[in-house]
Amino acid sequence: MDIDRIKNSIRNVPDFPKPGIQFKDITTLLQDKNAFKEAIAAFYIAFKDKEIDVIVGIESRGFIFAAPLALKMGCRFVLARKPGKLPSETIAEEYELEYGIDAIEMHTDAINKGDKVLIVDDLLATGGTAKATGSVVKKLQGEILSYAFLIILKGLKGDELLKPVPVFNILEY
């Protein structure tokens, strides 16, 4: 596994979307097939020995990593989406944004009682979206084994919000 290749494939965009932000652009990683393959391999190595029934990908960049990981691990893949994007009956959890409230939804039949669940997203910042996704999994009576992120912004302490559930990350800024 080549962590340096993964890290070097991510473009840093200063002052986006506003001054003072150092945006981590993963599109360059996705354009490098070997770096993308290394990222999926890093997730796989971390969880290959765990009994996971379902991998939940958080909209939208979480889908990019969760779907191939679910295929590689031989388990189900479930979408966690913004409100109004799923066509059947859903269950939701609201969470706070800097200027307002948003929500995350999943189909009510997406998780079975007792399913062991891994929740995947591209980046962990404050943890609000991941925590809300975990709340939906719990409402559906799934057991969260871990959260997994390509990138964690350690200074924002999102991992503390997700305790006591373990948090895995490939890169840290």
Task: Give, region by region, the residue ranges found by the protein language model.
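Active-site-facing substrate-recognition patch
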Residues: M1-E51
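PRPP-dependent phosphoribosyltransferase catalytic core
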Residues: D2, K131-Y173
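Short glycine-rich phosphate-binding loop at a beta-alpha junction
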Residues: I52-E59
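Conserved acidic residues
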Residues: D53, D115, L145
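Short, hinge-like loop/turn segments at secondary-structure boundaries
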Residues: M73-G74, E94-E98, K163-P166
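Short, glycine/charge-rich flexible loops or terminal/linker lids adjacent to PRPP-binding catalytic cores
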Residues: V78-V117
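Conserved G/P- and acidic residue-centered "switch" motifs that form tight phosphate/ATP-binding loops
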Residues: D122, G127
